[in-house]
Amino acid sequence: MDASLWDGVIASLPAGYRCVAPTLPLAAHRHAMNADADLSLPGLARLLAEFLDRLDLHDVTLVGNDTGGAIVQLLMGEGADRVGRVVLVSCDAFDNWPPGLTGKVLALTGKLPPLVFGLFMQQMRLRPLRRLPVAFGWLTKRGDAVTARWMRPVLRQAEIRRDAVRVLRAVFADRDILVRAAERLPGFGRPALVVWASEDRVMPPAHGRRLAELIPDARLVQVGDSYTLIPLDQPGILARVIGEFAG
């Protein structure tokens, strides 16, 4: 996925917010990473921290959904000096890594050579296959057009396929990383909002409740009629609760 995940949310936020939505190298990026780039989950967290540094952002409301929420949790454990508050939106947590059926299939595809991986991913050109539970079917109810666009770089660019395989191998190499990250969350002393899809079939709703209980200054909001990718399924509701939280 890329930054377009947040288009609907950003468009629905009240005026006055400066919104910056980076595209991390999660297989929908258009420019290949350097061969020595660290594409593990901690490496992606450091990349995001560097992004905040380079833009010299302060008192950031950092929002993460799906894998983005896992990256935010790692930053929370590291202190995240530039972050004033966080929003965790239906995301990987605790022992749900790789997440659900979708994540487990992705982890297996990451074991393929890039050429074979590319041939396998060609199936995602077809909407009925994208809508399967092992693809995007359990991640979003309404976002098929967006997910089809996300697939273009990995379908068209060999260098992005190589990055995708590297990312999948690196991020899923450590199956307990989010269990350890959760142990550090009680030390996060800034406000947190946990937003979870009540119908989520990939990220257990019980994990949303656990995160809200674990983080000292956190509250939980549940969103109906949505799967994991709430920014696609319910952008208006998510924008409203983020706006209320960020003040």
Region spans (language model):
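Glycine-/small-residue-rich active-site loops that bind phosphorylated ligands and cofactors
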Residues: 1, 173, 200, 227-229
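Conserved catalytic core of Hanks-type protein kinase domains
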Residues: 12, 214, 232
